[in-house]
A protein has these predicted regions:
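Non-Sec secretion/translocation targeting segments of pathogen effectors
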Residues: 124-128, 136, 140-154
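Helix-rich interaction surfaces within compact, conserved domain-sized segments
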Residues: 70-80
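Short, structured protein-protein interaction patches enriched in aromatics and acidic/basic residues
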Residues: 40-63
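Contiguous interface-forming segments/domains that mediate binding rather than catalysis
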Residues: 18-25, 42
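Short, extreme N-terminal segment that most often corresponds to the first beta-strand
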Residues: 1-14, 18, 152
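Extended coiled-coil/helical scaffolds and adjacent low-complexity linkers that mediate multimerization
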Residues: 87-123
Length: 154
């Protein structure tokens, strides 16, 4: 079955998972839980005990207004829905959810509210891309000889 695999700290990728319960459990590292947070015919399959096991927090689930209502812990994948079983994730939905989950997230609690901070996406060459790339890699924006942070807008 073709799925979109989403691992903590990594960009999502297309994967092939075998049929039956055991391959599904292996993909998420334990008992599975299927949730249906979207109007599209997709299931999000995660580890049912991921939070209790202390698995790394992965991605936030948001409501229609963009507010976080849950955070998935550990690996999860998205697959299609058949009449009575899970199926291949169609190519258009694969791309839609790849874009939605493209950036790994870190989570912080500020004033009692949990915020998701999108992380830069490594390029295929292993370089960080995005506006903060130069700063994070110590390029033109970084620390000067005295150890002070400098660069555009800093």
């Amino acid at each position: 079955m073709k799925v979109l695999m989403v691992e903590p700290g990594k960009v999502p990728y297309a994967a092939e998972i075998g049929e039956g319960l055991e391959p599904l459990q292996a993909a998420v590292g334990g008992d599975i839980q299927a949730v249906y947070p979207y109007d599209d015919p997709v299931a999000l399959i995660c580890n049912e005990e991921g939070k209790y096991m202390g698995l790394p927090l992965n991605r936030a689930l948001r409501d229609d207004e963009g507010n976080i209502y849950d955070i998935v812990a550990g690996n999860f994948f998205l697959c299609g829905l058949g009449e009575e079983d899970f199926t291949d994730l169609p190519a258009d939905l694969m791309e839609k959810y790849r874009q939605q989950f493209e950036h790994p997230e870190q989570f912080v609690r500020i004033a009692g509210k949990i915020l998701a901070v999108k992380q830069p996406v490594p390029s295929p060459e292993g370089r960080i891309s995005g506006d903060r790339a130069l700063f994070l890699q110590g390029g033109a924006a970084g620390r000067n000889a005295a150890g002070r942070v400098h660069g555009p807008g800093l």
